[in-house]
């Protein structure tokens, strides 16, 4: 799950178009990591929506992950409430090139 402490996925921050990594914290929110320095200046003026970027091939691009409010530039407020999950479906597949 994205909220898992060991989870990291490539994301894109819109409307500014910067790529970053969303990291789970083990809590009800995530954090932005590995983002360009210009990010801090751009987020001061607007709220940011976090989407999957599609890099790495694990998730399709454009899946909404959460929102970042300008008063806390590193915290992702997930759109999903992971505490409400009762069941999780696990799908196993091979990445291209893996056997």
Predicted segment positions?
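A secondary-structure micro-motif
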Residues: 1-99
């Amino acid at each position: 799950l994205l909220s898992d402490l060991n989870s990291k996925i490539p994301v894109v921050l819109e409307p500014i178009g910067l790529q970053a990594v969303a990291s789970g914290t083990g809590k009800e929110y995530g954090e932005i990591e590995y983002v360009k320095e210009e990010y801090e200046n751009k987020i001061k003026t607007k709220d940011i929506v976090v989407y999957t970027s599609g890099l790495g091939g694990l998730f399709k691009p454009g899946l909404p992950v959460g929102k970042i409010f300008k008063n806390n530039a590193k915290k992702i407020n997930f759109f999903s409430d992971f505490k409400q999950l009762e069941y999780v479906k696990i799908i196993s597949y091979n990445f291209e090139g893996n056997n």
